Amino acid sequence: HIPKGDVPRDDVEEECEKYEASIKKAGGIDLQILGIGKTGHIGFNEPGSGSDSRTRRIALDTVTRRDAAADFFGEDNVPTEAITMGVATIMEAREIAIVATGEHKAAIIKRAVEGEPDPDVAATYLQQHPNAVFYVDFASGADLTRIRTPWVIGEVKWNREREIDAVIWLGETTGKSVLKLDENDYREHHLSALLARHGKAGPLNGEVFNALIAKIRGRSKLPAGKKVVVFSPHPDDD
């Protein structure tokens, strides 16, 4: 039950109207399952798609065509246009599930979930749906505030790894090296609780600095003279 993509150009508008009518005849969509493109498109609702858009022909964005190249044996073979359900058509579904995996989707997942509704990122419209859920793995959700910087939004259960992440983030945010961070930096960036655990910035900065140096110089701790099994390449290397 998808729009026909091979109808003659002169028949596209009629086909789109038939598709919309078939949805209404079926009583609407109970569950709409979506992916999300790097540009934030859902379906093929590329940047600029309005919230009132319906099933229609649309020109494909360069990024979308490039991402689809592997499925068409080269970018030159990817169609330049497609027929897509509109944003309004999608939003009428009773439930919506958005599925994303991989670190290459992290930036757009953050924008779709936490950014303001924006015609340039169609997925942001889903924030306005009463029953839409994003299903993401750790990699694609890594940039979400609740994962990347949970101390910004609430209480945190601190451990050594999270402390190191927080101090590195603080250095990046303030533009300072780790050893130059002071108490005010911690207080002004939602890290008062972390500062309270250590009393002063200096000792904490030193611990994190030493941990980073140990990682850089810790090659002697890597396996040596042992057999290593590589199960698969990185999923983004295909």
Positions of the model-derived regions?
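Conserved phosphate- and dinucleotide-binding cores of soluble alpha/beta proteins
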Residues: H1, G5-D165
